[in-house]
Each structure stands twice: as structure tokens, then as C-alpha cells.
Amino acid sequence: MHEVSLVHALFDQVDRAIAPHPSSAARLLIVRIGELAGVETELFRTAFAGCKAERGYQAAMLEIEPEAAEWRCAECGATFPTGAPLQCTRCSGFARLFAGGDIILLRVELEVVDV
């Protein structure tokens, strides 16, 4: 289950993002997971729940935004949904994956602890 290593990489990003704010705690992580990112969303949620306490994020919640795959013609820019032929019907150019292939940390919401 590579989702565990992806969750640890996510926490590494969060560590770097909140380092300038030592008196804060991450409360919400919003992550975009693409349809073709090779990630099982439910396994990712399970890995997050299982790893967050050991990384010091026991109070953090996870919100996932799914992203549909979208292909774009390299020649003319026409877009295609997943499942369509990967050759442009407009110009016969080849399509490339434009969206839906990544995992992106979109936002970290912090709670600032009074000192």
C-alpha cells in the first residue's frame, strides 16, 4: 500500500509549510487527488488516519478534492475526457494528460496557539 508513503510525503510538505509558524497546529489539509494519480482514495484516508498521530497531526482533518482526468491536444489545445481516443478529432494531433494525474496539497488551515 503505497498510500502510506504518500501520506508521509504529505506530512513532510505540511512540516515545511508550518515551520515558520512554530506556535500553530494544522487543523485541516485539503488535497487534490487526480483520477489517474494511481491513488486509492479510501486507502489514502485510512493511511492518513493511521499515521497522523505518529507525525504530530492527531487533530488534523483531511479533505480530498477529486480531479477528473483531462487530456489536451499538443497541437491545437482541444480537450478530451478520459476514455476518448487519444488522437485529436480536430487536427489529428496526439493528446497529453493535462489534469488528473497529480496529488496536490492545496491548502493547510492552521490554528494559532496563544503563547
Specify the residue positions occupied by each region the protein language model found.
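Long, charge-rich boundary regions
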Residues: M1-H2, I104-V115
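Long, charged N-terminal interaction/targeting segments
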Residues: M1-Q58
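Short loop/turn motifs enriched for small/polar and acidic residues
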Residues: R32-L36, E65-A69, V108
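Short, intrinsically disordered, charge-biased short linear motifs at domain edges
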Residues: Q58-I64, R72-T79
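Flanking scaffold residues of small Cys/His-coordinated metal-binding clusters
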Residues: E67-A68, T82-G83, G100
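Cys/His-enriched microdomains
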Residues: W71, L86, I103
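Short cysteine-rich clusters marking metal-coordination/redox-active sites
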Residues: C73-A74, C88-C91
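Short functional micro-motifs and their immediate structural scaffolds
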Residues: T79-P81, A95-L97
